[in-house]
């Protein structure tokens, strides 16, 4: 399948995950799910554990790296179990300092292979809200001036349409950037345009969306964003 081929084509690319551990992540992710309510923090854990296998297929040589917004420590991940241990005793609290965490990654100041390394880097940002240390205009300027070898996907961990729309409006159109909604919302949007979206393909979009425009355009009408060759089915 095309998705597998695309993932294999970026094998060896370094991947880092910036995970939101701010206090707002303690809110219920889906208020309509009264049978099995989960917080955004719990959903982030589950998503990252599921993503781990796919990320390790791509960044297989030295694992991928995870950093939390309110903890400067970088964690090197080599297995799904490593991800699980990250959350032992860890609570979501604090603010949303996206600017402070993203600036070194976007500028090349910090890279898994060393300062100012020129190899490609995929940055996955899992967050639920507005940055607390930079405005959306400031975020747009910062992301817009990133190194061309850095690709960014924002994975939205919120049901708040206003927040998702703010990210879409300010950064989604920047080159090398994608906004990926939660699976249920993204699936609904993709299917509204006559396409299908499995959970596996949604995870692939999260990894590939910033680098490969056809994944960024999955939730647009057929023919948008470059024609039929960009349609993922």
Which stretches of residues belong to each language-model region?
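Surface-exposed acidic, glycine-flexible loop patches that form ligand/cofactor-binding
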Residues: 5-9, 54-58, 106-118, 141-144
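Short coil/turn segments at secondary-structure boundaries
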Residues: 12-14, 28-33, 78-82, 135-139, ...
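Cysteine-dense, membrane-associated helical/juxtamembrane modules
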Residues: 13, 219-233
């Amino acid at each position: 399948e095309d998705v597998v081929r695309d993932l294999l084509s970026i094998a060896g690319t370094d991947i880092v995950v910036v995970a939101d551990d701010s206090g707002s992540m303690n809110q219920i992710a889906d208020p309509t799910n009264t049978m099995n309510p989960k917080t955004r923090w719990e959903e982030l854990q589950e998503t990252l554990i599921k993503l781990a296998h796919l990320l390790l297929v791509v960044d297989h040589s030295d694992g991928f790296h995870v950093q939390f917004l309110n903890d400067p420590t970088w964690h090197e991940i080599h297995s799904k179990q490593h991800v699980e241990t990250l959350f032992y005793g860890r609570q979501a609290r604090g603010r949303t300092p996206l600017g402070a965490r993203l600036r070194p990654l976007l500028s090349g100041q910090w890279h898994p292979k060393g300062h100012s390394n020129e190899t490609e880097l995929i940055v996955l940002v899992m967050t639920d809200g507005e940055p607390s240390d930079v405005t959306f205009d400031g975020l747009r300027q910062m992301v817009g001036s990133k190194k061309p070898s850095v690709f960014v996907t924002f994975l939205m961990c919120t049901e708040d349409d206003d927040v998702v729309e703010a990210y879409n409006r300010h950064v989604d159109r920047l080159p090398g950037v994608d906004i990926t909604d939660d699976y249920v919302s993204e699936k609904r949007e993709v299917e509204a345009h006559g396409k299908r979206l499995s959970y596996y393909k949604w995870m692939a979009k999260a990894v590939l969306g910033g680098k490969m425009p056809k994944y960024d355009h999955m939730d647009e009408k057929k023919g948008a964003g470059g024609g039929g060759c960009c349609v993922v089915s």
